[in-house]
């Protein structure tokens, strides 16, 4: 399988980047995008050239480390799949693949296709801590949570923090990410005391450092965890609830 690759090369955050063209003649349809980059890098190293820098870890779709733009789309052409699960079977012999970092004003490029996504970490940091009772662990049956609520919390906790939602959004909004966290945390038995304060701080952080949400829906289309667009509603719901409550909870 022959592919023409245009891969982003950028020495550092302040350096000017450019696409570097490479032709691959022996790509295999079962390869992932990351494995294709591994293959390219092996050839570069053998030739004494600098390999392309990109982020990856588990390659099982659960860590959120990998993240690339492929032909302008976060992760790749297949919906709701991370970069490590995007296979070359989606492409045809002779296709051109333009591979670059996730693009957002909130994600400065560190090198090549590695970006700094710590802006998402700062949203979570604003969530703070949760209060727990000291002493021995309580019996599980004393924490009342029905099955439907637990499933809803787990569905939203599935967010892997890859940041593709922000890169896909024309406004650069992080409302799907933040909404998923707020839904998950609001449903858990622990942390009720801090619910209001948590919502206020997280919403303030996301609206300060990311763009506004216009409900375009591109975020949900690329989310590897399949977080629904309805999660965005938690932003206004939790903010309104916090504004109407005189207490943190």
Q: What spans do the regions from the language model cover?
A:
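Short structural boundary motif marking the start of a folded domain
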Residues: 1-5
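Short polar catalytic/cofactor-binding loops
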Residues: 7-13
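Short strand-turn-strand beta-turns centered on an Asx-Gly dipeptide
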Residues: 8, 25, 70-72
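Short, contiguous acidic and Ser/Thr-rich linear segments
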Residues: 19-32
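Ferredoxin-type iron-sulfur electron-transfer modules in oxidoreductases and energy-metabolism complexes
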Residues: 31-50, 98-249
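Short, structured protein-protein interaction patches enriched in aromatics and acidic/basic residues
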Residues: 53-65
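Glycine-rich phosphate/adenylate-binding loop and adjacent beta-alpha elements
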Residues: 70-94, 99
């Amino acid at each position: 399988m022959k592919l023409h690759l245009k891969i982003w090369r950028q020495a550092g955050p302040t350096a000017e980047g450019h696409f570097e063209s490479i032709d691959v003649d022996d790509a295999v349809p079962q390869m992932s995008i990351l494995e294709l980059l591994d293959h390219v890098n092996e050839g570069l190293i053998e030739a004494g050239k600098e390999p392309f820098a990109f982020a990856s870890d588990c390659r099982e779709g659960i860590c959120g480390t990998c993240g690339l733009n492929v032909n302008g789309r976060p992760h790749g052409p297949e919906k709701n799949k991370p970069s490590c699960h995007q296979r070359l079977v989606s492409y045809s012999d002779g296709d051109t693949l333009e591979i670059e970092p996730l693009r957002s004003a909130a994600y400065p490029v560190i090198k090549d296709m590695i970006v700094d996504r710590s802006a998402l970490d700062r949203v979570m940091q604003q969530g703070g801590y949760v209060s727990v009772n000291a002493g021995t662990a309580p019996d599980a049956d004393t924490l009342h949570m029905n099955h439907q609520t637990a499933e809803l919390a787990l569905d939203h906790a599935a967010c892997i923090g890859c940041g593709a939602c922000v890169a896909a959004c024309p406004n650069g909004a992080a409302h799907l990410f933040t909404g998923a966290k707020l839904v998950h945390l609001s449903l858990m038995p622990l942390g009720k005391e801090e619910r209001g304060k948590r919502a206020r701080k997280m919403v303030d952080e996301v609206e300060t450092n990311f763009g506004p949400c216009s409900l375009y829906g591109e975020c949900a289309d690329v989310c590897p965890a399949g977080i629904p667009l309805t999660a965005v509603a938690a932003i206004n719901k939790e903010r309104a609830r916090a504004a109407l409550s005189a207490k943190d909870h």
